[in-house]
Protein backbone atom coordinates (compact mmCIF):
# COMPACT_ATOMS: atom_id res chain seq x y z
CA UNK A 1 0.00 0.00 0.00
CA UNK A 2 1.21 3.50 -0.84
CA UNK A 3 2.89 5.61 1.82
CA UNK A 4 1.77 9.22 1.62
CA UNK A 5 3.23 12.07 3.60
CA UNK A 6 3.76 15.80 3.29
CA UNK A 7 4.26 18.36 0.52
CA UNK A 8 7.08 20.71 1.45
CA UNK A 9 9.17 23.07 -0.66
CA UNK A 10 7.46 22.13 -3.90
CA UNK A 11 7.84 18.36 -3.61
CA UNK A 12 6.56 15.29 -1.80
CA UNK A 13 8.39 14.89 1.50
CA UNK A 14 8.35 11.53 3.28
CA UNK A 15 9.18 13.14 6.58
CA UNK A 16 11.38 12.40 9.55
CA UNK A 17 8.93 10.41 11.66
CA UNK A 18 8.39 6.66 11.55
CA UNK A 19 4.88 7.06 12.93
CA UNK A 20 2.05 6.72 10.43
CA UNK A 21 -1.70 6.25 10.26
CA UNK A 22 -4.04 4.61 7.75
CA UNK A 23 -6.85 6.28 5.85
CA UNK A 24 -9.85 4.11 4.90
CA UNK A 25 -12.57 4.16 2.27
CA UNK A 26 -15.79 4.87 4.21
CA UNK A 27 -17.89 2.96 1.68
CA UNK A 28 -16.20 -0.41 2.15
CA UNK A 29 -13.74 -0.13 5.02
CA UNK A 30 -10.76 -0.89 2.80
CA UNK A 31 -7.48 0.97 3.44
CA UNK A 32 -6.56 3.64 0.91
CA UNK A 33 -3.08 4.65 2.04
CA UNK A 34 -0.69 4.82 4.93
CA UNK A 35 0.17 8.41 5.80
CA UNK A 36 3.14 9.73 7.77
CA UNK A 37 2.44 11.63 10.99
CA UNK A 38 4.45 14.86 11.07
CA UNK A 39 6.85 15.61 13.90
CA UNK A 40 8.62 18.80 14.97
CA UNK A 41 11.36 18.36 12.36
CA UNK A 42 8.79 18.10 9.59
CA UNK A 43 6.99 21.15 10.93
CA UNK A 44 10.17 23.19 11.03
CA UNK A 45 11.02 22.12 7.49
CA UNK A 46 7.62 23.39 6.37
CA UNK A 47 8.12 26.66 8.26
CA UNK A 48 11.54 27.31 6.73
CA UNK A 49 10.23 26.46 3.28
CA UNK A 50 7.27 28.81 3.76
CA UNK A 51 9.62 31.61 4.81
CA UNK A 52 11.61 31.24 1.60
CA UNK A 53 8.48 30.97 -0.50
CA UNK A 54 6.88 33.98 1.15
CA UNK A 55 9.90 36.16 0.37
CA UNK A 56 9.53 35.37 -3.34
CA UNK A 57 5.73 35.36 -3.55
CA UNK A 58 5.13 38.57 -1.63
CA UNK A 59 7.66 40.41 -3.80
CA UNK A 60 5.78 39.52 -6.99
CA UNK A 61 3.22 41.90 -8.38
CA UNK A 62 -0.43 41.15 -7.74
CA UNK A 63 -0.93 40.61 -11.47
CA UNK A 64 1.85 38.02 -11.54
CA UNK A 65 0.27 36.20 -8.61
CA UNK A 66 -3.10 36.36 -10.31
CA UNK A 67 -1.81 34.70 -13.48
CA UNK A 68 -0.40 31.77 -11.51
CA UNK A 69 -3.62 31.29 -9.56
CA UNK A 70 -5.66 31.36 -12.77
CA UNK A 71 -3.39 28.68 -14.23
CA UNK A 72 -4.14 26.55 -11.16
CA UNK A 73 -7.86 27.10 -11.75
CA UNK A 74 -7.54 25.82 -15.32
CA UNK A 75 -5.68 22.71 -14.15
CA UNK A 76 -8.24 22.02 -11.44
CA UNK A 77 -11.12 22.19 -13.90
CA UNK A 78 -9.24 20.05 -16.39
CA UNK A 79 -8.73 17.34 -13.73
CA UNK A 80 -12.13 17.66 -12.09
CA UNK A 81 -13.18 14.04 -12.64
CA UNK A 82 -9.90 12.56 -11.38
CA UNK A 83 -9.95 14.72 -8.25
CA UNK A 84 -13.64 14.02 -7.63
CA UNK A 85 -13.06 10.25 -7.73
CA UNK A 86 -10.26 10.55 -5.17
CA UNK A 87 -12.42 12.76 -2.98
CA UNK A 88 -15.22 10.19 -3.09
CA UNK A 89 -12.85 7.40 -2.07
CA UNK A 90 -11.58 9.45 0.87
CA UNK A 91 -14.90 10.92 2.08
CA UNK A 92 -17.64 8.48 1.06
CA UNK A 93 -19.78 11.22 -0.52
CA UNK A 94 -21.67 10.49 -3.78
CA UNK A 95 -19.79 11.06 -7.02
CA UNK A 96 -22.76 13.07 -8.32
CA UNK A 97 -21.95 15.66 -5.63
CA UNK A 98 -18.17 15.66 -5.89
CA UNK A 99 -18.21 15.90 -9.68
CA UNK A 100 -20.23 19.10 -9.78
CA UNK A 101 -19.58 20.80 -6.42
CA UNK A 102 -16.39 20.09 -4.51
CA UNK A 103 -13.67 20.90 -7.04
CA UNK A 104 -15.80 23.26 -9.13
CA UNK A 105 -16.78 25.57 -6.27
CA UNK A 106 -13.27 25.55 -4.86
CA UNK A 107 -11.84 26.53 -8.24
CA UNK A 108 -14.44 29.29 -8.47
CA UNK A 109 -13.12 30.77 -5.22
CA UNK A 110 -9.51 30.71 -6.43
CA UNK A 111 -10.61 32.38 -9.66
CA UNK A 112 -12.51 35.02 -7.69
CA UNK A 113 -9.53 35.96 -5.53
CA UNK A 114 -7.18 35.86 -8.51
CA UNK A 115 -9.40 38.55 -9.99
CA UNK A 116 -9.40 40.59 -6.79
CA UNK A 117 -5.64 40.45 -6.20
CA UNK A 118 -4.66 43.26 -8.60
CA UNK A 119 -7.41 45.52 -7.24
CA UNK A 120 -6.23 45.43 -3.62
CA UNK A 121 -5.22 48.92 -2.60
CA UNK A 122 -4.72 51.25 0.30
CA UNK A 123 -6.01 54.75 0.93
CA UNK A 124 -4.48 58.21 0.65
CA UNK A 125 -5.67 61.34 2.40
CA UNK A 126 -4.19 64.86 2.54
CA UNK A 127 -4.01 66.35 6.02
CA UNK A 128 -2.76 69.86 5.25
CA UNK A 129 -0.53 71.60 2.72
CA UNK A 130 2.60 69.83 3.93
CA UNK A 131 1.34 66.44 5.11
CA UNK A 132 -0.57 63.48 3.81
CA UNK A 133 -0.78 59.83 4.74
CA UNK A 134 -1.31 56.65 2.82
CA UNK A 135 -1.98 53.05 3.79
CA UNK A 136 -0.69 49.77 2.43
CA UNK A 137 -2.40 46.40 2.74
CA UNK A 138 0.44 44.00 3.34
CA UNK A 139 0.40 40.22 3.71
CA UNK A 140 0.65 38.68 7.17
CA UNK A 141 3.37 36.16 6.36
CA UNK A 142 2.84 32.45 6.97
CA UNK A 143 -0.78 31.42 7.49
CA UNK A 144 -1.94 28.05 8.77
CA UNK A 145 -5.03 26.36 7.39
CA UNK A 146 -6.59 23.51 9.36
CA UNK A 147 -9.20 21.65 7.35
CA UNK A 148 -12.21 19.45 8.04
CA UNK A 149 -13.05 16.05 6.58
CA UNK A 150 -16.40 16.78 4.93
CA UNK A 151 -15.12 18.97 2.06
CA UNK A 152 -11.34 18.39 2.12
CA UNK A 153 -10.19 19.86 -1.18
CA UNK A 154 -12.83 22.58 -1.28
CA UNK A 155 -11.81 23.79 2.19
CA UNK A 156 -8.13 23.71 1.19
CA UNK A 157 -8.98 25.94 -1.77
CA UNK A 158 -11.27 28.24 0.23
CA UNK A 159 -8.48 28.86 2.75
CA UNK A 160 -5.54 29.07 0.38
CA UNK A 161 -7.20 31.29 -2.25
CA UNK A 162 -7.45 34.55 -0.23
CA UNK A 163 -4.21 33.82 1.60
CA UNK A 164 -2.20 33.39 -1.60
CA UNK A 165 -3.96 36.20 -3.46
CA UNK A 166 -2.93 38.58 -0.68
CA UNK A 167 0.71 37.49 -0.95
CA UNK A 168 0.95 35.10 2.01
CA UNK A 169 2.36 31.59 2.23
CA UNK A 170 0.23 28.80 3.71
CA UNK A 171 0.88 25.58 5.59
CA UNK A 172 -2.25 23.45 5.32
CA UNK A 173 -3.13 20.55 7.59
CA UNK A 174 -5.92 18.38 6.21
CA UNK A 175 -7.95 16.19 8.53
CA UNK A 176 -6.27 12.86 9.19
CA UNK A 177 -9.54 11.26 8.01
CA UNK A 178 -9.14 12.77 4.52
CA UNK A 179 -5.47 13.50 3.80
CA UNK A 180 -5.21 12.78 0.08
CA UNK A 181 -6.68 15.53 -2.10
CA UNK A 182 -4.77 18.37 -0.42
CA UNK A 183 -1.60 16.75 -1.77
CA UNK A 184 -3.06 16.86 -5.28
CA UNK A 185 -3.92 20.53 -4.83
CA UNK A 186 -0.34 21.25 -3.77
CA UNK A 187 0.99 19.51 -6.88
CA UNK A 188 -1.37 21.54 -9.08
CA UNK A 189 -0.28 24.80 -7.47
CA UNK A 190 3.35 23.91 -8.17
CA UNK A 191 2.58 22.94 -11.75
CA UNK A 192 0.84 26.28 -12.21
CA UNK A 193 4.03 28.10 -11.21
CA UNK A 194 3.57 28.77 -7.51
CA UNK A 195 7.05 29.25 -5.98
CA UNK A 196 8.28 26.38 -3.82
CA UNK A 197 7.19 26.71 -0.22
CA UNK A 198 4.22 29.00 -0.79
CA UNK A 199 1.72 26.16 -0.25
CA UNK A 200 2.86 23.31 1.97
CA UNK A 201 0.80 20.36 3.23
CA UNK A 202 1.65 18.69 6.52
CA UNK A 203 -0.16 15.58 7.72
CA UNK A 204 -1.26 14.31 11.09
CA UNK A 205 -3.70 14.44 13.96
CA UNK A 206 -4.43 17.10 16.57
CA UNK A 207 -0.75 17.21 17.56
CA UNK A 208 0.12 18.80 14.22
CA UNK A 209 -2.63 21.35 14.74
CA UNK A 210 -1.14 22.17 18.12
CA UNK A 211 2.29 22.66 16.55
CA UNK A 212 0.81 25.11 14.07
CA UNK A 213 -1.14 27.11 16.64
CA UNK A 214 1.87 27.28 18.97
CA UNK A 215 4.57 28.14 16.44
CA UNK A 216 5.74 31.76 16.73
CA UNK A 217 6.37 32.06 12.98
CA UNK A 218 2.73 31.39 12.10
CA UNK A 219 0.92 34.73 11.80
CA UNK A 220 -2.64 33.50 11.35
CA UNK A 221 -4.75 30.37 11.78
CA UNK A 222 -7.86 29.57 9.76
CA UNK A 223 -9.75 26.59 11.18
CA UNK A 224 -12.82 24.65 10.10
CA UNK A 225 -14.27 22.09 12.48
CA UNK A 226 -16.46 21.61 15.52
CA UNK A 227 -16.92 24.32 18.11
CA UNK A 228 -15.17 22.57 21.00
CA UNK A 229 -11.99 22.14 18.98
CA UNK A 230 -12.31 25.72 17.78
CA UNK A 231 -12.12 26.95 21.37
CA UNK A 232 -8.89 24.99 21.85
CA UNK A 233 -7.41 26.37 18.62
CA UNK A 234 -8.27 29.92 19.64
CA UNK A 235 -6.85 29.44 23.12
CA UNK A 236 -3.59 27.99 21.82
CA UNK A 237 -3.25 30.76 19.24
CA UNK A 238 -3.72 33.46 21.87
CA UNK A 239 -0.30 32.80 23.41
CA UNK A 240 1.38 34.36 20.37
CA UNK A 241 -1.50 36.72 19.47
CA UNK A 242 -2.17 35.06 16.15
CA UNK A 243 -5.03 36.28 14.05
CA UNK A 244 -7.75 33.61 14.01
CA UNK A 245 -10.74 32.92 11.82
CA UNK A 246 -12.88 29.85 12.26
CA UNK A 247 -15.94 28.29 10.72
CA UNK A 248 -17.49 25.99 13.30
CA UNK A 249 -20.58 23.91 13.99
CA UNK A 250 -24.25 24.66 13.66
CA UNK A 251 -27.78 23.57 14.46
CA UNK A 252 -29.44 25.79 11.93
CA UNK A 253 -33.16 26.59 11.70
CA UNK A 254 -35.22 26.35 8.54
CA UNK A 255 -38.56 28.16 8.92
CA UNK A 256 -41.39 27.19 6.58
CA UNK A 257 -44.47 29.43 6.67
CA UNK A 258 -47.93 28.36 5.55
CA UNK A 259 -47.70 30.30 2.27
CA UNK A 260 -44.47 28.62 1.18
CA UNK A 261 -44.30 26.63 -2.04
CA UNK A 262 -44.63 23.21 -0.44
CA UNK A 263 -42.68 21.22 -3.03
CA UNK A 264 -39.78 23.67 -2.81
CA UNK A 265 -39.84 23.62 0.98
CA UNK A 266 -39.74 19.82 1.12
CA UNK A 267 -36.92 19.75 -1.44
CA UNK A 268 -34.92 22.29 0.53
CA UNK A 269 -35.46 20.47 3.82
CA UNK A 270 -34.12 17.28 2.25
CA UNK A 271 -31.08 19.03 0.78
CA UNK A 272 -30.50 20.81 4.09
CA UNK A 273 -30.36 17.52 5.98
CA UNK A 274 -29.29 14.72 3.65
CA UNK A 275 -26.79 16.30 1.25
CA UNK A 276 -23.34 14.79 1.84
CA UNK A 277 -25.07 12.29 4.17
CA UNK A 278 -25.83 15.13 6.55
CA UNK A 279 -22.16 15.96 7.11
CA UNK A 280 -22.44 19.70 6.42
CA UNK A 281 -22.03 22.33 9.12
CA UNK A 282 -24.61 24.67 7.56
CA UNK A 283 -27.37 22.07 7.39
CA UNK A 284 -30.83 23.15 8.51
CA UNK A 285 -31.41 20.31 10.94
CA UNK A 286 -34.18 22.09 12.87
CA UNK A 287 -37.08 22.34 10.42
CA UNK A 288 -39.86 24.56 11.79
CA UNK A 289 -43.12 24.05 9.87
CA UNK A 290 -46.26 26.17 10.33
CA UNK A 291 -49.14 24.25 11.84
CA UNK A 292 -51.34 25.08 8.85
CA UNK A 293 -49.26 22.95 6.47
CA UNK A 294 -47.54 20.66 8.96
CA UNK A 295 -49.48 17.48 8.16
CA UNK A 296 -49.20 17.88 4.40
CA UNK A 297 -45.49 18.68 4.70
CA UNK A 298 -44.90 15.52 6.74
CA UNK A 299 -46.73 13.33 4.21
CA UNK A 300 -44.68 14.65 1.29
CA UNK A 301 -41.44 14.54 3.25
CA UNK A 302 -41.90 10.88 4.20
CA UNK A 303 -42.76 9.84 0.67
CA UNK A 304 -39.82 11.62 -0.93
CA UNK A 305 -37.25 10.76 1.73
CA UNK A 306 -37.97 7.06 1.30
CA UNK A 307 -37.19 7.37 -2.43
CA UNK A 308 -33.60 8.51 -1.79
CA UNK A 309 -30.98 6.07 -3.06
CA UNK A 310 -28.38 4.95 -0.52
CA UNK A 311 -25.52 3.12 -2.19
CA UNK A 312 -22.03 2.91 -3.63
CA UNK A 313 -20.73 6.49 -3.77
CA UNK A 314 -19.15 5.83 -7.18
CA UNK A 315 -22.53 4.91 -8.67
CA UNK A 316 -23.98 7.94 -10.47
CA UNK A 317 -27.46 7.01 -9.18
CA UNK A 318 -26.42 7.14 -5.51
CA UNK A 319 -27.78 10.13 -3.59
CA UNK A 320 -26.70 9.21 -0.04
CA UNK A 321 -23.16 8.01 0.56
CA UNK A 322 -21.19 6.71 3.52
CA UNK A 323 -20.38 8.49 6.77
CA UNK A 324 -16.73 9.31 7.25
CA UNK A 325 -15.77 6.58 9.77
CA UNK A 326 -17.02 3.74 11.94
CA UNK A 327 -16.60 5.98 14.97
CA UNK A 328 -18.73 8.71 13.46
CA UNK A 329 -21.34 6.22 12.30
CA UNK A 330 -21.58 4.94 15.86
CA UNK A 331 -22.06 8.50 17.14
CA UNK A 332 -24.86 9.17 14.64
CA UNK A 333 -26.62 5.88 15.41
CA UNK A 334 -26.36 6.61 19.13
CA UNK A 335 -28.03 10.00 18.60
CA UNK A 336 -30.80 8.28 16.63
CA UNK A 337 -31.41 5.78 19.43
CA UNK A 338 -31.54 8.62 21.95
CA UNK A 339 -34.11 10.39 19.78
CA UNK A 340 -36.17 7.20 19.50
CA UNK A 341 -36.32 7.09 23.30
CA UNK A 342 -37.68 10.65 23.45
CA UNK A 343 -41.27 11.76 22.87
CA UNK A 344 -40.48 12.53 19.23
CA UNK A 345 -42.02 10.31 16.54
CA UNK A 346 -39.78 8.44 14.12
CA UNK A 347 -41.28 9.19 10.70
CA UNK A 348 -38.83 7.20 8.60
CA UNK A 349 -35.35 5.69 8.70
CA UNK A 350 -33.41 5.27 11.90
CA UNK A 351 -31.05 2.39 11.12
CA UNK A 352 -27.75 1.32 9.58
CA UNK A 353 -27.97 0.13 5.99
CA UNK A 354 -26.60 -3.40 5.51
CA UNK A 355 -28.31 -4.73 2.37
CA UNK A 356 -27.03 -4.59 -1.23
CA UNK A 357 -23.42 -5.16 -0.21
CA UNK A 358 -23.24 -2.07 2.01
CA UNK A 359 -22.70 -3.81 5.36
CA UNK A 360 -18.95 -3.14 5.42
CA UNK A 361 -19.45 0.59 4.84
CA UNK A 362 -20.69 3.37 7.11
CA UNK A 363 -24.19 3.83 5.71
CA UNK A 364 -27.10 5.28 7.69
CA UNK A 365 -30.52 5.65 6.10
CA UNK A 366 -31.98 9.18 5.92
CA UNK A 367 -33.88 9.65 9.17
CA UNK A 368 -36.70 12.03 10.11
CA UNK A 369 -38.18 12.69 13.54
CA UNK A 370 -41.43 14.67 13.78
CA UNK A 371 -43.31 16.16 16.72
CA UNK A 372 -39.98 17.27 18.14
CA UNK A 373 -39.56 19.68 21.04
CA UNK A 374 -36.91 22.35 21.42
CA UNK A 375 -35.22 20.86 24.47
CA UNK A 376 -34.71 17.36 23.05
CA UNK A 377 -31.01 16.44 22.78
CA UNK A 378 -31.24 15.55 19.08
CA UNK A 379 -32.79 18.99 18.44
CA UNK A 380 -30.14 20.90 20.39
CA UNK A 381 -26.96 18.96 19.62
CA UNK A 382 -25.10 18.81 16.32
CA UNK A 383 -25.30 15.23 15.01
CA UNK A 384 -23.57 15.70 11.63
CA UNK A 385 -25.46 12.89 9.97
CA UNK A 386 -28.65 12.36 7.93
CA UNK A 387 -31.03 13.14 10.80
CA UNK A 388 -33.81 15.75 10.47
CA UNK A 389 -35.90 17.16 13.32
CA UNK A 390 -39.30 18.62 12.37
CA UNK A 391 -41.00 21.04 14.76
CA UNK A 392 -44.44 22.68 14.58
CA UNK A 393 -44.99 26.42 15.14
CA UNK A 394 -48.00 28.74 15.08
CA UNK A 395 -46.81 32.35 14.78
CA UNK A 396 -43.91 34.50 13.67
CA UNK A 397 -42.69 35.83 17.01
CA UNK A 398 -42.77 32.37 18.52
CA UNK A 399 -40.70 30.76 15.79
CA UNK A 400 -38.10 33.54 15.83
CA UNK A 401 -37.55 33.06 19.56
CA UNK A 402 -37.33 29.29 19.17
CA UNK A 403 -35.01 29.50 16.17
CA UNK A 404 -32.62 31.67 18.19
CA UNK A 405 -32.74 29.34 21.20
CA UNK A 406 -29.37 27.74 20.50
CA UNK A 407 -25.70 28.39 21.20
CA UNK A 408 -25.02 28.16 17.47
CA UNK A 409 -25.55 30.80 14.80
CA UNK A 410 -24.16 29.54 11.54
CA UNK A 411 -27.06 29.48 9.07
CA UNK A 412 -30.81 29.97 8.73
CA UNK A 413 -33.48 29.98 6.07
CA UNK A 414 -37.04 31.19 5.56
CA UNK A 415 -39.59 29.88 3.07
CA UNK A 416 -42.53 32.19 2.35
CA UNK A 417 -44.08 34.05 -0.58
CA UNK A 418 -44.40 37.17 1.59
CA UNK A 419 -41.11 38.96 0.96
CA UNK A 420 -41.75 41.56 3.66
CA UNK A 421 -42.08 38.77 6.20
CA UNK A 422 -39.07 36.95 4.77
CA UNK A 423 -36.77 39.92 5.30
CA UNK A 424 -38.35 40.86 8.63
CA UNK A 425 -37.80 37.37 10.03
CA UNK A 426 -34.31 36.87 8.60
CA UNK A 427 -33.18 40.19 10.09
CA UNK A 428 -34.10 38.90 13.55
CA UNK A 429 -32.43 35.50 13.24
CA UNK A 430 -29.03 35.23 14.91
CA UNK A 431 -27.11 33.59 12.09
CA UNK A 432 -24.34 34.62 9.73
CA UNK A 433 -25.45 32.80 6.56
CA UNK A 434 -29.09 33.18 5.59
CA UNK A 435 -31.23 32.09 2.66
CA UNK A 436 -34.72 33.03 1.51
CA UNK A 437 -36.64 30.41 -0.50
CA UNK A 438 -33.49 28.39 -1.13
CA UNK A 439 -30.82 26.59 0.86
CA UNK A 440 -27.11 25.91 0.65
CA UNK A 441 -25.79 28.07 -2.18
CA UNK A 442 -22.45 29.63 -1.25
CA UNK A 443 -21.02 31.62 -4.18
CA UNK A 444 -17.46 32.86 -4.06
CA UNK A 445 -18.64 36.46 -3.85
CA UNK A 446 -20.66 35.93 -0.65
CA UNK A 447 -18.90 36.06 2.74
CA UNK A 448 -19.85 33.12 4.96
CA UNK A 449 -19.37 32.55 8.67
CA UNK A 450 -21.19 32.25 11.94
CA UNK A 451 -22.49 34.08 14.98
CA UNK A 452 -22.11 32.88 18.59
CA UNK A 453 -20.39 29.46 18.87
CA UNK A 454 -20.45 28.99 15.11
CA UNK A 455 -17.33 30.96 14.38
CA UNK A 456 -15.30 34.12 14.05
CA UNK A 457 -14.50 35.96 10.84
CA UNK A 458 -15.61 35.08 7.33
CA UNK A 459 -14.59 33.03 4.33
CA UNK A 460 -15.14 34.10 0.72
CA UNK A 461 -16.18 37.54 -0.45
CA UNK A 462 -14.10 40.73 -0.46
CA UNK A 463 -14.32 40.93 3.33
CA UNK A 464 -12.12 37.87 3.79
CA UNK A 465 -9.08 39.62 2.35
CA UNK A 466 -9.01 41.76 5.50
CA UNK A 467 -8.31 38.56 7.47
CA UNK A 468 -5.17 37.90 5.40
CA UNK A 469 -3.70 41.40 5.30
CA UNK A 470 -2.50 44.00 7.76
CA UNK A 471 -2.63 47.75 7.32
CA UNK A 472 0.50 49.86 7.35
CA UNK A 473 -0.01 53.62 7.71
CA UNK A 474 2.62 55.99 6.32
CA UNK A 475 2.55 59.73 7.12
CA UNK A 476 4.58 61.90 4.74
CA UNK A 477 5.82 65.38 5.71
CA UNK A 478 6.80 67.62 2.79
CA UNK A 479 8.21 70.61 4.65
CA UNK A 480 10.87 71.18 7.29
CA UNK A 481 10.55 69.29 10.55
CA UNK A 482 9.40 71.62 13.33
CA UNK A 483 11.25 70.38 16.39
CA UNK A 484 10.05 71.25 19.91
CA UNK A 485 13.68 71.19 21.01
CA UNK A 486 16.31 73.85 20.47
UniProtKB/Swiss-Prot annotation:
MF GO annotations: betaine-aldehyde dehydrogenase (NAD+) activity; metal ion binding
Single GO biological process annotation from the record: glycine betaine biosynthetic process from choline
Binding-site positions, K(+) 1: 23, 90
EC number in record: 1.2.1.8
Binding site for K(+) 2: 241, 452, 455
Pathway: Amine and polyamine biosynthesis; betaine biosynthesis via choline pathway; betaine from betaine aldehyde: step 1/1
UniProt-annotated binding residues for NAD(+): 147-149, 173-176, 226-229, 249, 281, 382
Cofactor annotation comment: Binds 2 potassium ions per subunit.
Residues modified to Cysteine sulfenic acid (-SOH): 281
Substrates-to-products reaction catalysed: betaine aldehyde + NAD(+) + H2O = glycine betaine + NADH + 2 H(+)
Protein name as catalogued: Betaine aldehyde dehydrogenase
